[in-house]
Design a protein with these regions (language model features):
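Trp/Phe/Arg-rich N-terminal binding region typifying the photolyase-homology
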Residues: 1-81, 185
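Glycine/tryptophan-enriched, flexible segments
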Residues: 62-197
Length: 198
């Protein structure tokens, strides 16, 4: 796809990083193509709190033990959070360069096994934030115990929303850490966000 772009196309390309090795390698290949064609681009931190290479021990090597890693990583994140939200400017000119004629029916599997997930997960940013709010209001205070019992609805169930970019871990951290000093279960939940990055 990127190799078909022409230098005369007036566009800028933006994307968020995905941190699996194959994706990082692909990012480098895309960078080379865009630089060669003189097309401007910018990529941003993915759905994480910190870039992995920014959290190291004093000697510059990666942490091998979770507790010191997370103590350091959480502080780096807190120190970097801006004090107030910046205003997001709307894009004035946008061009759709994806001309796929595939319909929803064509790209979905022939068997409708995926329909059962409708009762568990409704994909949207709005639903992700509703789920987070419901978890904070009703279950986070007992998360430390309830998460260990599959028969209890004790987890946040936010994984698919995080995976598909419908909620950012920074929003989860910000909203769920408000009462962190009052409840050890909240601390345990926040630590789970750290495990994603470790």
């Amino acid at each position: 796809f990127f190799s078909k772009l022409k230098t005369k196309d007036k566009l800028s390309i933006y994307w968020n990083k995905v941190y699996e090795p194959d994706h990082l390698k692909l990012d480098k290949e895309i960078e080379k193509i865009l630089e060669k064609k003189n097309i401007s681009f910018k990529f941003f931190k993915g759905n994480i709190l910190n870039e992995y290479q920014s959290i190291t021990k004093n000697d510059g090597t990666p942490f091998k033990v979770f507790t010191p890693f997370w103590r350091n990583a959480e502080q780096v994140y807190i120190d970097a959070v801006p004090q107030k939200s910046s205003e997001i400017k709307k894009l004035k000119n946008k061009k759709n360069i994806f001309n796929s004629k595939d319909t929803f029916k064509q790209i979905m599997p022939k068997k409708d096994w995926f329909k059962k997930f409708d009762q568990y997960w409704k994909p949207s940013e709005e639903e992700a934030h509703k789920s987070l709010k419901e978890f904070i209001n009703n279950r986070i205070s007992k998360y430390g115990i309830d998460r260990d019992y599959p028969s209890i609805n004790g987890s946040s169930k936010l994984s698919p929303y995080i995976r598909n970019g419908q909620i950012h871990v920074a929003a989860i951290y910000e909203k769920s850490s408000k009462d962190i000093k009052k409840n050890t279960s909240i601390r345990k939940y926040i630590n789970e966000l750290g495990w994603r990055e470790f």
